[in-house]
């Protein structure tokens, strides 16, 4: 039994660029109505009655509540959350091997609060909105797809806070899927490897040759549309629930 995307309503966090933008565009192309939640105002080419742009921070309870309420006011319901917002920063280390000094606490805190606490915040606030939905033929009332990473499965010593936050998202998604199963709500995470996104390019430095970074096979970076296609596949496949969907070109150890 395939879940229909057309006429469904989704909130996409981090929808202003990268994986989130590609996800929002694909869902809109498939006939969904989408609220794009981003730190920056998003300007789109889709009809006004199909898309809503809300500026805010996933760490802010009031911002997320405002986005959810705006979604209900405009579209009348919420069928799913595609949580793509996240950060990756240079200097992500608990201990600097060169200076023999502790890592920058501000950097570590920003990564963990955005990636992990932002995921907690969006997930917890969205759940009540699913409960008023009429269940489909499978009994589903809603779906959450979080964005983790291959580094959540195999941590990088050069990105300690990022890896830790992504591992926690994997655990959160599975635990939440089990808890919400009796309510008809699915929860998944997608664990991509190296992606060709503005965030990744900023992290490695625009002056470096991006071609030096690649997954095993295909030997290139993941394109955002490939992540979006994985989102579409998960939405349309009801039995995908409580697992980490690894999109990595065999890069994981």
From Swiss-Prot:
Enzyme active site: 162
Binding site for substrate: 149
Tissue expression per record: Specifically expressed in male midguts. Expressed at higher level in the anterior midgut of fed males.
Record GO cellular component, one term: cytosol
GO MF annotations in UniProt: oxidoreductase activity, acting on the CH-OH group of donors, NAD or NADP as acceptor
Enzyme class name: oxidoreductase
Pfam families in the cross-refs: adh_short
Record's subcellular location: Cytoplasm, Cytosol
Swiss-Prot/TrEMBL keywords: Cytoplasm, NAD, Oxidoreductase
Function recorded in the entry: Catalyzes the oxidation of racemic ipsdienol and (4R)-(-)-ipsdienol to form ipsdienone (2-methyl-6-methylene-2,7-octadien-4-one), an intermediate in the biosynthesis of pheromonal ipsdienol in male pine engraver beetles. In contrast, (4S)-(+)-ipsdienol is not a substrate.
Family of the protein in this entry: Belongs to the short-chain dehydrogenases/reductases (SDR) family.
PANTHER family: 17-BETA-HYDROXYSTEROID DEHYDROGENASE 14-RELATED, SHORT-CHAIN DEHYDROGENASE/REDUCTASE
Protein's name in the database: Ipsdienol dehydrogenase
Gene designation: IDOLDH
